[in-house]
C-alpha cells in the first residue's frame, strides 16, 4: 500500500508530455512499422541484381522452407520484442513496489521519478518508465529491421541456396560457361518467386541484427536497474539474452540461410543501434535529473558596503587632516578593537608617516579628548610613502587612575634605585612603553632586557607586529618609532619613561635609569620649578634628546602619546571639557601645530625656536620643548616625569588655533600652562590652567635646557 505521505504528495504538471508522445513518438514508431510492412511483406521494393558464377557450389546449398526453419521470422520478432518488453515491465513493477514500500518515491537504486499531471491524467513513475523504455525498444527493433532491409536491398547479395531456388537456364546465354563463367543476366527458371527474391537478400542477416539488438538493449537495462546485491541474478539474465541472440544468428549459418560474414555483420549492426539508443534515448535507464531551482544571486550587504565606503573616504582624505576621528562614535564606548597593520618589508621601518590617534572614551555631552602627533617629513634614505592606511590609526585608550598611581610609583622607585649606578656621558633617555598588565619589578627588568633584544632583531628583520597599544621608542640616529606589541584586553594605558633601548654602540641598559636619576636630582635642586609642563612637550623632549642635531635626525623624528583620566574620577565640569592638540608635519617645509584650548590657551615661545631649527638645516622637535613656558613647578619635578591631574577650569567647548613652528605665525599671547607630574600628583591626566610666569620657573627651565644641550654636546663632540 502506498503511504499517506506519498498519496498526498503534489505531482508536477507537464505541458509537453502528451503532445510529445502523440505528435512525435507515436508517428515515428508508426511510420517505422508501415515501412517494415512494405519492405517485408510486399514485393514493392525489389533487391538489386548481382551476377554469379556458373555452377557456384557456395550458392548451391539446400534450401530449407520457411516453415521448417528453427527460428522463423515471426518467432524472431516475437522473441526479440516480447521477451525484452516483458522483462522490462516485470522489473519496473517490482521496482515501483519496492520504492513505494521501502525507499519511498525519493529513493531507490534506479532513481526516483515523481508523478506527473498531464491532460488531466496522473502518470506515476511505473507507467512513465515502462512506456518510455518499452517504446524505445520497439522503435529500436523497427529501426534495426529497416536498416537491415535497406542494406539487403541495396547490396542484393545471394544466399547459400540461391542457385537451388533460382534454377538458372544456361542455354539462354548463347555461350558456354567455359567462355563466360560470370553471369549477370536473369536466367532463373524457378517457379517460387518469393524464394528467389529472399535468396537475393542475405547481407546482413536479419536474425542476427534483431537478436543482437534485443540482447544488448535488455542487458544494459538489467545492468542499470538491478543492484549488485542480487549476486547472480543480473549475470544470469544478461547471459540468457546473449546466448539466445547467438543461437538465432548461428542457426542461419547451420541451415544455410546466410553466410557467416552476414551473421557477424548483423551482430555488430544490432549491438551498435542498441547501445546508442540505451545511452542517448533513455539516458542509460536512469531517472532524469530533477530541475533544481536556480540559486538566487547573493544580496549585497548594505552594511558592509556602507562600512567599506566610510573606510575609503577616510583613507583617501587629505594627509594634512590628522585630527579627524576615524572610528564611529558608537564604537568608542565599547571594548577596544585591534588595529590591523600589514607586515611589509624592511623599508616599512623607515616609513615617512606615522599618525596615531589616541581617543579616550566619549564623555556625556562632550567631545572626546584626543592628542595627535604627526610627522611625515621625508627621509633622506628612503622615499616617502603616502599610503593613507598607514597614516591613520585609531586606538581607544581606557584609563584608570588607580593603575596610573601604581605604575608611576613603581617607575619613581626604580629611578631612585638607579641613582647609585652612575651616569654615563653618552646616556640617552629610554623609550615610552604602554603597560597592559601588572608586573613585579623583577619581571619588568627581565622584560626590558627582552625588549632590547627584540628591538635589535626588529631592525634586521622587519616591522613590529600590530597591536592595540603603541610603544614609542627613541632610537639614537634613527629617530623615535611606534611599535604596537600584541597586548590583549582593555587595561589602562599610561605612558611612562623607562630604560633606554640598546640600539646604538656604546649604550648600556642602565643608561636610561641614570639619566632619569640625574633629572630628578636636578629638579630637586631647582627649588621652585615650572609647574606641570604638558605631557606633549615631555614626549617631544625625550624623543629629541638622543637624536642628532642634524637635518636627517630632525626629519626622522616622530612620536605619539596620549593620556586622559577616567570619567568616573572627574567632576562633571571636567568631563564636559575637551582638549585637542595636534602637531601636523605634513607640509613639505614647515610643520604646523593645531591647538584646541577651551579658553586658557597654550603658551609657546616666540618664533625663535622654529627659526633656529630651520637655520640648522632641519626641524628639531626638541626646540618645541625648550620653547614651552609654563606655570610654577613644585619641587621634585623632572623633565621625564609623567603627567599629573590638576583642576581644569576651561569652558565646555574650545576653539582651534594653528601655529607655524617655522615662522612663528599664529602664536598665541604669552600665558601659563601646565603639564608634567609633580611628587604630590598620582593621576596621569593632561590638564591645563592659566597661571603666571615667575623668576624661579625661568631659572629651572634654563637649567633643564642647559642640561639638554650639554648631553647633546657630549654625545656628538664633533
Curated annotation (Swiss-Prot):
What membrane topology does the UniProt entry give? Multi-pass membrane protein
List residues, modification Phosphothreonine: 376
Q: Does the keyword Protease apply?
A: no
Q: Which residues carry this modification: Phosphoserine?
A: 322, 353, 428, 508, 641
Transport recorded as keyword? no
Q: Where is it localised?
A: Membrane
Instruction: Please provide the Gene Ontology terms (biological process) for this protein.
Output: phospholipid dephosphorylation; phospholipid metabolic process; signal transduction
Mind telling me what this protein is named?
A: Phospholipid phosphatase-related protein type 3
Q: Which gene encodes it?
A: PLPPR3
